[in-house]
Amino acid sequence: MKYQQLENLESGWKWKYLVKKHREGELITRYVEASAAQEAVEMLLTLENEPVRVNVWIEEHLNPALFNRLKQTIRARRKRHFNAEHQHTRKKSIDLEFLVWQRLAGLAQRRGKTLSETIVQLIEDAENKEKYATKMSSLKQDLQALLGKE
């Protein structure tokens, strides 16, 4: 396993995820009967600061359809948590208009690169173009100076 599991922290994430899903109207319990489901949800709501009991609740009451999604969410959250510790792995966000993002995504796809790699490539292309323009301007001035002196 690449990232260390932190039981207490991850239980808090699981609790928040399940409460959010419940508030969004998803069935988070395995029970079909509304009263049993409501009772299990009320029990979950009291367990916010009890990580061990949150995990027991999940084993006993979680809707099987949510199990894989919960695991994937926690795995992604764990990765973001550990990557955020180091500057070079921390993700940054930028605001792009949708059409700009769409064009960038299309270019990245055509080049077979990630969005980040495509942005770096575009920056390098622009820098090379600047260097070329500066060099050509310098050569042009030198040529004019040579022709002007004769």
Swiss-Prot record:
HAMAP family: MatP (MF_01073). It holds the Pfam family MatP_C. GO terms for biological process: cell division; regulation of DNA-templated transcription. InterPro entries: Arc_rbn_hlx_hlx, MatP, MatP_C, MatP_N, MatP_N_sf. The keyword Cell division applies. Belongs to the MatP family. This is Macrodomain Ter protein. It comes from Citrobacter rodentium (strain ICC168) (Citrobacter freundii biotype 4280). Required for spatial organization of the terminus region of the chromosome (Ter macrodomain) during the cell cycle. Prevents early segregation of duplicated Ter macrodomains during cell division. Binds specifically to matS, which is a 13 bp signature motif repeated within the Ter macrodomain. Keywords: Cell cycle, Cell division, Cytoplasm, DNA-binding.
